[in-house]
Amino acid sequence: MTKKIVTLSGDGIGPEIMAAGLGVLDKVASKIEFDYDVDAKPFGGAGIDAEGHPLPKATLEAAKSADAILLAAIGGPKYDNAPVRPEQGLLAIRKELNLFANIRPVRIFDALKHLSPLKPERIEGVDFVVVRELTGGIYFGEHILEEDKARDINDYSADEIRRIMRRAFKIAQGRGKKVTSIDKQNVLATSKLWRKVADEVSLEFPDVTLEHQLVDSAAMIMITNPARFDVVVTENLFGDILSDESSVLPGTLGVMPSASHSENGPSLYEPIHGSAPDIAGQGIANPISMILSVAMMLRESFNETEGAELIENAVDKTLNQGILTRDLGGQASTAEMTAAIISNL
C-alpha cells in the first residue's frame, strides 16, 4: 500500500536538506520495497510568502490526511518584525494534529566525540531518548500579567500524564527497558500527580524499570553521567529545558533528529536545528539531522526497521570515513555528504 508523505521544506536551508533526505529515502525505498508518494506543501515563511499564513489551509488539510510529515526548517530574519511569524505555523500544526509527544534521541557518534563539550569518558555509551509532553502544562495554562504582579497557571490532568507515560514506556520496551520520570514532586502539585500516575502506568509494564528524579538532580546527571539514562519522560516546561541541555552532548545540532506524535493521527519528523539563513543557498548545510529524521519516520510511522537501520548505519559509516560537513570540521558540501551516505547504503 502506497504511503503518503507530506513534505514541508520551509525556509532557509530547508529546501536543500529536504532534497537530501528525500534522496536517501528514494534509495532506501528501492531496497526495502517501500512505496510512497510525496506531497510538497508551503509552510512557515514559505507559507506566508505564498498565501499570507505560515500554515495555509491546503497545507493543514494535506497534513491531516498524510501517513507522515517531514519538516525541514522554518524562520528567517525577514520575518523578525512581521505581524505573522513562521513559528506560529509550527505551534498551529502541533495543536491541529494534537502532537502531544515530542521524541528526541540523544546519541554520541564515535567519529564526533571530539566535538562534545564533555570529556570522552563522560559521554562513553550515551544513547538515550527524551520524551517531552508537548500540549499541556504551563505553556498552555492561563497567563496573567498585571502592573506589578504576574502568574502563570500550570495545569495537567491524569489522562494527559497517562498517555505520555504510556508512550515513554512503550519506547523503553524496545530499548533498555528503563524509564526515568522527571518532576519537582517535592514542591509542585502537578508533579505530585505526575509521579502518582507514573507509578500507576508502570504497573502496566512489568518488564520496564521506573525511577524518579527531581528535575534539578536530573539536570546535573545529564552532564555528570548521561549514560545512566535510557528513556527520560517529563512535562512540557522541564522537557523544553532538558531536551535543549541534552542537545549539546553530541557537540553539534547537525546530527539530531526529532519526532512529534499524536495518538492516532500522523506524526511529524524534523531536525532540531534552525533554518540557518546565513548559509542558505550555498550548498554547505549539514543534511544528517534531516536524513536521520527520515530514518525515524521509517521506524516509528511505518515499522520499517530495516530501512531505518540501513540509513543509520550508512550515516555512521560515512562519518567514520572522515566525510564531514563544515559544521563538523570538514569540507564536504550538502551534495557530497548526501552522495556518500547513499553510496554507503
Curated annotation (Swiss-Prot):
Q: Which Pfam families match?
A: Iso_dh
Q: Where does substrate bind?
A: 94, 104, 132, 216
Q: Tell me yes or no: is Amino-acid biosynthesis among this UniProt entry's keywords.
A: yes
Transport among keywords: no
A Gene Ontology molecular function term of the record: magnesium ion binding
Taken from the UniProt entry, a GO cellular component term is:
cytosol
Question: Where does this protein hold NAD(+)?
Answer: 76-87, 274-286
The catalytic activity, as recorded, is:
(2R,3S)-3-isopropylmalate + NAD(+) = 4-methyl-2-oxopentanoate + CO2 + NADH
Which compartments is it annotated to reside in? Cytoplasm
Q: Which residues bind Mg(2+)?
A: 216, 240, 244
Keywords in alphabetical order, please: Amino-acid biosynthesis, Branched-chain amino acid biosynthesis, Cytoplasm, Leucine biosynthesis, Magnesium, Manganese, Metal-binding, NAD, Oxidoreductase
Known pathway? Amino-acid biosynthesis; L-leucine biosynthesis; L-leucine from 3-methyl-2-oxobutanoate: step 3/4
Q: Tell me where the signal peptide lies.
A: none
Positions marked as site (Important for catalysis): 139, 184
Q: What is its main location?
A: cytoplasm
Cofactor binding description = Binds 1 Mg(2+) or Mn(2+) ion per subunit.
Q: Which GO terms describe its biological process?
A: L-leucine biosynthetic process
SUPFAM superfamilies to which the protein is assigned, alphabetical: Isocitrate/Isopropylmalate dehydrogenase-like
Identify its protein family: Belongs to the isocitrate and isopropylmalate dehydrogenases family. LeuB type 1 subfamily.
* UniProt subunit comment: Homodimer.
As for what it does, the entry says: Catalyzes the oxidation of 3-carboxy-2-hydroxy-4-methylpentanoate (3-isopropylmalate) to 3-carboxy-4-methyl-2-oxopentanoate. The product decarboxylates to 4-methyl-2 oxopentanoate.
Question: What protein name applies here?
Answer: 3-isopropylmalate dehydrogenase
* Source organism phylogeny: Bacteria, Bacillati, Bacillota, Bacilli, Lactobacillales
